Amino acid sequence: MSTQPDPVYGAGPVADAAAFDAVNRETGKATGLPNPAYTSDRFSVLERDGLLANTWLCIGAAGALTARGQARPVTVLGLPLFMVRDADGINVFHNVCSHRGHQLVNLPCRMRGAIRCPYHSWTYGFDGVLKGTPHIGGPGVHAAAGFDKSLHGLKRIRSERWMDLVFINLSGDAPPVEAFLAPLADRWRPYLSDDDPSRLKLAPDDDNFTLEIEANWKLAVENFCEAYHLPWIHPGLNRYSRLEDHYQIIEPGRFAGQGTRVYDPVYRNGAEFPEFSGWPADRRKVAEYIALFPNVLLGLHVDHFYAVVLVPVSHNRTREEMNIYYLDDAANGDTYRESRRTTREAWRSIFFEDVGVVEGMQRGRQSPAFGGGAFSPVMDPPTHCFHRWVASGMLAARP
């Protein structure tokens, strides 16, 4: 492939195919993604339209929208979207009115009966169909000759659900979500019986949390993939789940992460959570932490499951939304309230410890002295796996 700058991508390291080719070398000889992959607005748009649009991107938890008409806006690298619960499930649309382009949903809300544009009060059903066009034909005239409402509904985005998570495919032509998830489903099949996923329920809002990070979303993925930083960034965790207790997880092109062999839940004054019925007794202390590319961080334990949705707001802003799931009544029952709070605070503490690291890497990417860095051939293969996924996708997206 030519290493000449591509006029569509622009001159400089953002466009240089050689920079991406260098990522695809063997781990000990590879270079990481170039700085503009983290610092450039233009790269973010190209990344969104050429990489993220062609796969399945997670945008949130369906369980957070419990009633018909509940809606929530989501911004993906500047692209305004929203999801809304209808009688048949969750629908996802571009967050823009078909009339004059006003944004429809600004904040999480519960809408009664219809989606209403605040500008001229055009209304849409929760299925996206245009229902009302007040005064379109003049005062008191709500229809216009030649105007076909069926052609002006909201623009729906292809979406699917898995483990309560809502995934979207912006391009509309990605392989089925089942194929996308198959390698992960195969990996976790020994731990989960067929009915275990249906037993999972999202904990109440106050048993979850959100962190606002001033950094590129990819840095949060990279940090999550590896256990290398545990002794220095998570000294409390490292006291019982040491670096040597972890193992690496790598599925090229799909996911990467780490596992531990010493997971030990602490309930303090709370009740013990129910456990997955299919979990092998001899692996009860195993827990796995997997970054499912591109943007969801998963934690599977014998007694709970979590999904951190990384919402890439802009090239240097990421929202980390922690969604914790428990089995059966443990998600909402008063009996387990203290146990849920203990679990939430434990995870919040750990993820908060990572904030400074991720933001520090973002600041460091402003330095011309850094050119992607290096990878430990022993400790960094999961992180390198993610870099290769990004680099390969960006190369494939070049005209």
Question: Can you name each region flagged by the protein language model?
Answer:
Residues 2-108, 158-159:
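N-terminal pre-ligand scaffold of iron-sulfur
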Residues 60-65, 147-149, 285-289, 323:
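Short linear motifs in intrinsically disordered
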Residues 53-64, 135-143, 290-294:
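Short Pro/Gly-enriched beta-strand edge/turn motifs at strand-loop
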Residues 64-172, 178-186:
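Rieske [2Fe-2S] iron-sulfur-binding domain
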Residues 2-4, 84, 94-95, 160-161, ...:
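C-terminal catalytic domain of Rieske-type non-heme iron oxygenases
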Residues 55, 77-79, 155, 293, ...:
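Short beta-strand or tight-loop elements
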Residues 11-41, 109-121, 155-163, 238-273:
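N-terminal short leaders/motifs
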